[in-house]
Amino acid sequence: GVSGITNIVGVFFVKEYLDLSAVFLAGLGFWAGLPWVLKMPLGHLVDILWKFKSLLVLLGAIVMATSSVIMFGLIQYKVQMLTILNAETWFVISTLLAPIGFVLQDVVADAMTVEAVPKIDENGNEINFNELKSMNVSMQLLGRVSIIFGTLLVSILNLIVFADSSEMTELEKVKAYGDIYLYSLIVPIISISGIFL
């Protein structure tokens, strides 16, 4: 749910600062959606590389953070960023990196939900099917509740930041856009903290 924190800013950024056609953006949307299409085979890869799940979460967090830092830099330090690549190229790189990081973490999280439900009780007895099913349903419910909570949190944050956007100066808008990308770094931080907790 928290992953959508930059969606609104991304739309405004494209509209106000980039000269990209609708056809180009549709094509970019296809490529950005490709990691989600590949989620199933990536899930199988995670099963094969299970002992490295922490590294996969870390890699996903680094990729997500890189995407956010690129956009923050492009918004707040545009002149310096444009000496390396043009704005459209930076935007494309950032747009393609974000879903790769999210999918990497999502497939690990999916696999971990199965592992999180115990198969045996504290006495070493196998848990009966109905109780096991109930625990799995509870685990899925908690996951969905956290997604809803994250989405609401992000919506409220965007409402607060952009409440007076029509009255903002250009400099204030740029700062607000950049701040949202900085706030989005909380997502990989949450992921990395999960490795150590």
Regions found by a protein language model. Name each.
Residues 55-59, 180:
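Juxtamembrane helix-start motifs in multi-pass secondary transporters
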Residues 1-2, 34, 38, 66, ...:
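Hydrophobic/aromatic residues within the transmembrane alpha-helices of Major Facilitator Superfamily
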Residues 1-36, 97:
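Helix-loop boundary and gating motifs at the non-cytosolic
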Residues 15, 46-50, 162:
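Helix-capping/transition residues at the boundaries of transmembrane alpha-helices
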Residues 25-49, 58-67, 152-155:
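Central cavity-lining transmembrane alpha-helices of secondary-active solute carriers
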Residues 19, 50, 74-75:
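Helix-breaking motifs and short loop linkers at transmembrane-helix boundaries and internal kinks
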Residues 66, 75-92, 96, 104-197:
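Intracellular loop-helix junctions on the cytosolic face of multi-pass helical membrane proteins
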